[in-house]
Amino acid sequence: MIYSENTDEKSNQHTNNLYKPCEIENKWQEIWDKENLYKTDDKSSKKEKFYALSMFPYPSGNLHMGHVRNYVITDLIARFQRFQGKSLLHPMGWDAFGLPAENAAIERGINPNDWTKKNIAHMKSQLKLLGLSVDWDKEFATCDENYYLWTQFLFLELHKSGLVYQKESEVNWDPIDNTVLANEQVDSEGKSWRSGAKVEKKLLTQWFLKITNYTEELLQDLEKLSEWPERVKIMQENWIGKSKGANIIFKINEFENEKIKVFTTRPDTLFGVTYIAISINNPLINKISDNEILSKLENLKIYLKKNQDKDQKKIGIPTNLKAINPINSNEIPIWIASYVLDEYGTGAVMGVPAHDQRDFEFAKINFIDIKQVIIKDKDNDKSTFKLKNAFTDNGFLINSNNFNGLCNNDAKKQILEQGKINGWAEEEIHYRLRDWLISRQRYWGCPIPIIKCNNCGSIPVNKKNLPVKLPKEIEISSNKINSLGSYKDWVKTTCPKCGNLASRETDTMDTFMCSSWYFLRYPSSKCKTKPFEKDNVNKWLPVDQYVGGVEHAILHLLYARFLTKALRDNNLFDIDEPFKKLLTQGMVQAAAYKNTKTGKYISPKDIKDFNNPTDPNDDSKLEVLFEKMSKSKYNGIDPESVIKKYGADTARMFILFKAPPEKDLEWGDSDVEGQYRFLCRIWKLFLDYRNNESWDNQKNYNREKENSLTKSINIAIKEISNDIKNNQFNTAISELMKFYNSLSSSMIYVNKDLRKDAFKKFCILLAPFAPHIAEEIWNLIGYQKSVHLERWPIFNEDALKEDCYELVIQINGKVRDKINVGIDISEDQIKQKTLTRPNVRKWIDQKTIRKIIIVKGKIMNIVV
């Protein structure tokens, strides 16, 4: 980009020393847009590529500080890589389908499409205020017909390869949002990830994707992700939940040919099994004829359905069935237990109360025997004793026949081997991961491209008939938008196979389906014939730097990895993993004032004394907490108001300086003002530099100052470069401040060329952090091209070498003086300089010098 005439020095006379960020920023944002400065260089094959991407936002309507942090971090990294001469792809789009938009539209009585598009326009204008180096030509929203056409296309590709199926299943039902949730969308307390509702169970026919076909690859390939946070990889590993163990076969005493298979990771505790627990839907229940037991079971099912949020781990029903322990032929009771899940293992577990806390509590409440078979110390603890809790540590076997005395890990192997030989045990691997349920019973989502025919069953829509569009004219009631099944004209269609009357699938896809491939679309965002160009994906992917919240670790990130592998296997591209390097930024927090008596939060507007905050309603002392910004806590900060007051560059500098990116950031007005003052000082220094010709007086030149500034320049280049590469943006700004201090204290003492070179390099180093002020100063210095088209300076290692060192002077082994000497000084010159120094003379006068020992670079010892 060449500056046009209206940006040169003549038309930008700054008549005072005031830094006016809004004027500067508005001007340069307009110029950058007009000149298309950040357009992706799609055609360059010689340059190394860099794909920088933030997790795209849901268009809620307003930018918040969490957004700002995410996009500023990504922008800094993108700008830094552009300075390295790389070809940059830095796009932005919108995760636009989903329940929040539908619910907001219901509240306002408007079409969610209109609501979403309005929000996108507003948020885009807010994002542009930040001066992001985004290529807006790549922009799309997942609700665009020319995007969800390709979501449907990819669904059909997965269907063709056998990764899509439909089955009746007990599903997680959100009673507030009236839709199904995937397992990953239910939190540890059994609540919806979005609405917070207690999740219920329903039996529905649903569509699934076979993510379990890729379980082992998803797990093993975590090792390839060396530049991902370890905690994210651990979260995915735990969610996949690989368990190595064994299936143990227990015979049923009452039925000669009936057996029950139980999965366990602890064969070493087999001698301690005192009951078998089965789920409420286990097939073995069909063998029970006792009406009293069956009646209790029905009551338990009703209770569980009504009390899903309650702790039911101790609820059990004894049956009249007995199992035979294969290791010792002991007879053990079979219980129906609420804590046993149908979908885990075989829907049955072996109860070992002495060595599993859940089993221990169940046994205690139901008066079941507890038999200890592992002790901590085999030398001092020869017998069992009354346990207060289950013993779950490693140890040595007791009460286990010929396995007594073995450490439990060795016993696992030997017991399993015996079971394999005798036919009652087999090695087994289990996974916690379940197939991805993608059906949703709402309007605002991507329609599933399936036609249901009474003759032919479920038939995929012909690809040439995509997209299956959402009905435009919709019915909005007081509390819902009617689901797709309500639009009869839309539902009616013909079967593509037999031509008979048929109906469309009325479920929409989980919005995570749309967001699990969007990064593949950006390199070919305008392509009209396919979702993406294979060559473009192979060129630009994987994403070199992905930035987003850790809350997406087992939802978006896992789904995106799965979909990438599945589409690779459909020969759509050749990459294995979508994201090379992942940065999960911390939350932005601000002070919230809470009345601990009432639990209510008080608005800062109602607080008179912030040194001693009290509730104006009852004078209670308020607790000051730093919490995630929220409207309900009155601690939200509007980014637009901050930008209008201080400028985008100040907001960027604060966000990057206040805390390391992976840590939570605490908002502080004084810290924002501190960054603003720093930019003001930079601005004033530039004006002083530009307006003071007297600085070029050779009488002021100081060789030592010039050497010091040269060294500072190179230290800054080296340290800031390393800090950005290591995501240490706060320390990079600290180095920038040190460079500023050196520059400002040296200006009048150094020659013109060095001064200009220092300012040039300072501008480039500043540019990724504060791009507007750097561009303005660069332009006013007189450079014709944008600073953002420059190359990053390279530090000179030689300039960092010391030209002198501190020599410690000892007399008879005691330190008496210190002196700075040049690194090339001779020993004779050292003696001349030191022996005449007053602090040395007073210790050697009238004494005989026996010898002088000089260790160059360190010490001089005079022996007298």
UniProtKB/Swiss-Prot annotation:
NCBIfam families: leuS_bact
Listed InterPro entries: aa-tRNA-synth_I_CS (IPR001412), aa-tRNA-synth_Ia (IPR002300), Leu-tRNA-ligase (IPR002302), Leu_tRNA-synth_edit (IPR025709), M/V/L/I-tRNA-synth_anticd-bd (IPR013155), Methionyl/Leucyl_tRNA_Synth (IPR015413), Rossmann-like_a/b/a_fold (IPR014729), tRNAsynth_Ia_anticodon-bd (IPR009080)
PANTHER family: LEUCINE--TRNA LIGASE, MITOCHONDRIAL, LEUCYL-TRNA SYNTHETASE
HAMAP family in the cross-refs: Leu_tRNA_synth_B
Main location group: cytoplasm
EC number from the UniProt entry: 6.1.1.4
Any one Gene Ontology molecular-function term assigned to this protein's record: aminoacyl-tRNA deacylase activity
Keywords: Aminoacyl-tRNA synthetase, ATP-binding, Cytoplasm, Ligase, Nucleotide-binding, Protein biosynthesis
Annotated residues for binding of ATP: K631
GO cellular component: cytosol
UniProt similarity note: Belongs to the class-I aminoacyl-tRNA synthetase family.
Record motif 'KMSKS' region, residues: 628-632
Pfam families: Anticodon_1, tRNA-synt_1, tRNA-synt_1_2, tRNA-synt_1g
Protein name: Leucine--tRNA ligase
Subcellular location: Cytoplasm
Catalytic activity: tRNA(Leu) + L-leucine + ATP = L-leucyl-tRNA(Leu) + AMP + diphosphate
GO BP annotation list: leucyl-tRNA aminoacylation
Locus of motif 'HIGH' region: 57-67
Organism this protein belongs to: Prochlorococcus marinus (strain MIT 9515)
